[in-house]
Swiss-Prot record:
One Gene Ontology cellular component: ribosome
Any one GO molecular-function label of the UniProt entry: structural constituent of ribosome
Gene this chain is encoded by: rps11
Predominant place of localization: plastid
Originating organism: Emiliania huxleyi
An annotated GO BP: translation
Domain of life: Eukaryota
Annotated Pfam families: Ribosomal_S11
Disulfide bonds: none
Protein name: Small ribosomal subunit protein uS11c
Subcellular location: Plastid, Chloroplast
Family recorded in the similarity comment: Belongs to the universal ribosomal protein uS11 family.
Keywords tagged on the record: Chloroplast, Plastid, Ribonucleoprotein, Ribosomal protein, RNA-binding, rRNA-binding
Subunit (UniProt): Part of the 30S ribosomal subunit.
Length: 130
């Protein structure tokens, strides 16, 4: 009997998007960069931990820069030229991630900060005594 050989194709479909939205979530421990289209569907994402940084090195601005460069280069390869940037969180890698996106060739149209600010909500963590 003759067996049919199955040909495997990648499940990821290549989309060409001219403009998108870059979501940067910068916490005290990590930085996550996520690129979506205008409807909010995720196209590419990377984090500082996924780029090889572990432990305390994940929260550095250099780790955020490398995650943003990784995502930005993938987006430029797919044909993205313009992006809106939405930042949330109080972490270190906010500005360096935006600069890394601009250096990859993305034109930043708008920068929006949606960091949640409490109106005297929960008690903050105690101060460290080293």
């Amino acid at each position: 009997m003759i067996k049919q050989v199955k040909r495997f194709t990648s499940k990821k479909s290549k989309k060409t998007v001219n403009a998108g939205i870059v979501h940067i979530k910068s916490t005290f421990n990590n930085t996550i960069v996520n690129i979506t289209d205008k409807q909010g569907n995720t196209l590419f994402w990377a984090s500082a931990g996924g780029c090889g940084f572990k432990g305390a090195k994940k929260s550095t601005p250099f780790a955020a820069q490398s995650a943003a460069e990784k995502v930005g280069s993938m987006a430029v390869e797919q044909g993205m030229k313009q992006a809106e940037v939405i930042i949330s969180g109080p972490g270190n890698g906010r500005e360096t991630a935006i600069r890394a996106l601009q250096s990859c060739g993305l034109e930043v149209l708008l920068i929006k900060d949606i960091t949640p600010v409490p109106h005297n909500g929960c008690r903050p963590p105690k101060k460290r005594r080293v």
